[in-house]
């Protein structure tokens, strides 16, 4: 086993400071340690696809993200991973636990099939993967691999975590819920007396936004195409596929 803090510290040295994901008992030590760390951020996600979208937003904002979830949710992540992460060549580190490991003790029945096909599914997705480190020697090799794959080659990589890889880590105190303050909203009024077309609405948004300060994310389909046709600016991101993940990127 390795300590959660040790892994997080080594990853932090490479630049990984934002973690997002969906809970799994295997991941509890990493999640708890990242929550309590003064230098790391943990963003909970409601599902695995949203976690991948959040990670994409972190990278586009200048950070290096780590996505963590149970392999049972890998299917939820396939769409944004193949259509967003790989299409836009976003280098994220993903940690997927191996519930239903066919070479370990029997797990709950719902994990049986995914446990058998997790690594095969990653191969089909054409993403590189390796086992999550279980000792110090593995740790060094893993960090070297992450540096080569993600930092230097700008490619995503997945660590598949087996049960018992990380030592337990309990929260030192119960955390209070935090509310986001200072949210800025703007109401854009349309002077037109009749309904406007989508591209006319896009033009209104472009007119009201500053490309040096505002980010415009267009979801997949005609929205992105018409935004591009109206005005192609450096603050505009045209998402393809990954239905539902535009809000996560933002």
Language-model features: locations:
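Thiamine diphosphate
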Residues: 1-152, 157-250
